[in-house]
Amino acid sequence: MTTIAAVRKDGVTALAGDGQVTLGEKVIMKGNAQKVRRIYHDQVVIGFAGGVADAFTLQDWFEKKLEHYAGNLRRSAVALAQDWRKDPTLQKLEAMMIVMDEHDLLLVSGSGEVIDPDEDVVAIGSGGNFAQAAAIAMLRHAPDMTPADIAKEAVNIAGNIDIFTNHNVIVESF
């Protein structure tokens, strides 16, 4: 359980995520996990929500796709989604990812879908709906805020509401 939020504005994209890892639904195991990270020669940023082991498995599969498709984010995401739908091991994974590079911002869902958001905002995890609503409002009504500021504040707002999200927020931008 976590909150990951991405915002694209004026050619800049930012991805923010909190650091809380919860065991079951009662115990906070860690508060400073890094769920947003740069991969593929620092050219791609991913953020993941769901089971930790499942998220790492997805990251590994996605990195292999990026290597195979020479860093083409969209093609790699679609190939991962196709495998996700077909592979019995991947079908059991309980995780989602937001992936981005300088050109694309995509949600890769647990059902094997690749979604390019309409609103230039996408959020996942237990606090995802709170963060997405907050980010859309800031994007529309706070013109002086940067994408990084909006993404971070959206995760912090979710952290005020969602017990599975904390305020130890990491942000990466392109």
From Swiss-Prot:
Localization of this protein: Cytoplasm
PROSITE patterns listed in its UniProt record: PROTEASOME_BETA_2 (PS51476)
Top-level taxon of the source organism: Bacteria
InterPro entries in the cross-refs: ATP-dep_Prtase_HsIV_su, Ntn_hydrolases_N, Proteasome_sua/b, Proteasome_suB-type
GO biological process, alphabetically ordered: proteolysis involved in protein catabolic process
Activity regulation statement: Allosterically activated by HslU binding.
Catalytic activity: ATP-dependent cleavage of peptide bonds with broad specificity
Coiled-coil regions listed in the entry: none
EC code: 3.4.25.2
Keyword entries, A-Z: Allosteric enzyme, Cytoplasm, Hydrolase, Metal-binding, Protease, Sodium, Threonine protease
GO CC terms of this entry: HslUV protease complex; proteasome core complex
Keyword ATP-binding tagged: no
Binding positions (Na(+)): G159, D162, T165
Active site: T2
Subunit: A double ring-shaped homohexamer of HslV is capped on each side by a ring-shaped HslU homohexamer. The assembly of the HslU/HslV complex is dependent on binding of ATP.
Family per similarity comment: Belongs to the peptidase T1B family. HslV subfamily.
NCBIfam families linked: ATP_dep_HslV, PRK05456.1
Annotated protein name in UniProt: ATP-dependent protease subunit HslV
Gene source species: Lacticaseibacillus paracasei (strain ATCC 334 / BCRC 17002 / CCUG 31169 / CIP 107868 / KCTC 3260 / NRRL B-441) (Lactobacillus paracasei)
Lineage: Bacteria, Bacillati, Bacillota, Bacilli, Lactobacillales
Annotated gene: hslV
